[in-house]
Amino acid sequence: VLFLTFDDWGTDVPINRLLYVLRKHNVKATFFVRANYVEYNPNLLRSIAEEGHEIASHSYAHLPLADYNEGTGRYTSLTEEELLELRADLVRSYRELYRYVGDVEVDGVPSLSALFRPPTLSVSYEGLSQVFDVGFTYSVSGDFSTHDYEAESLEQLIDTFKNGIVTGQRRLRIQNGSCIVMHMSDESKYTAQALDIMIPIWKEQGYSFARLDSYLTQDGQDGGR
């Protein structure tokens, strides 16, 4: 199984392109939404939910769970003031999403889940403690971050999907169980088209696709499927 996930937010054009491709190939995905933009286009969020995709939080204002020190190149813990601000942000993000899609169910399955994706994928013990303390059940990063918003061409993004990502001396490749990190932003202009090409290839390789919450239970235990 592969898990297709999309972060942040975007305008009608990139998001509707993604929805078209997912619908065309009968694939469900997980959308980690930055909630502070949703109020400007709530019907677009409902469109995602009503297609049967999972809606989850990517924070309200993209506050990180750890501070990055440019001098050392390392992440450090948040201050007490930052933790309080983060906590309020987390609560607000879920409330905003619930406000617009909390009532949406498709085939008896709620669209809104209690999963969370950390902004910039950075974490700290104190930051994660806030995530779980306010009620989120899982913090989900991903094992294959495409950086699709940096792709300079369709061919480059397809090459990333097919041949992997080089990090240091390692080459990371998509494999069974991969959680693929993509974006629904306007900058990710090749993502939908690349998926239109790659999904049939992955299916031929024997992969299926699923929402993350179909493999993770709401009580924080593995679904075992």
Predicted regions and their residues:
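Active-site beta->alpha N-cap acidic-glycine motif
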Residues: 1-81, 92-114
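Catalytic domains of cell-wall/extracellular-matrix polysaccharide-remodeling enzymes
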Residues: 39-40, 64-181, 185-202, 207-208, ...
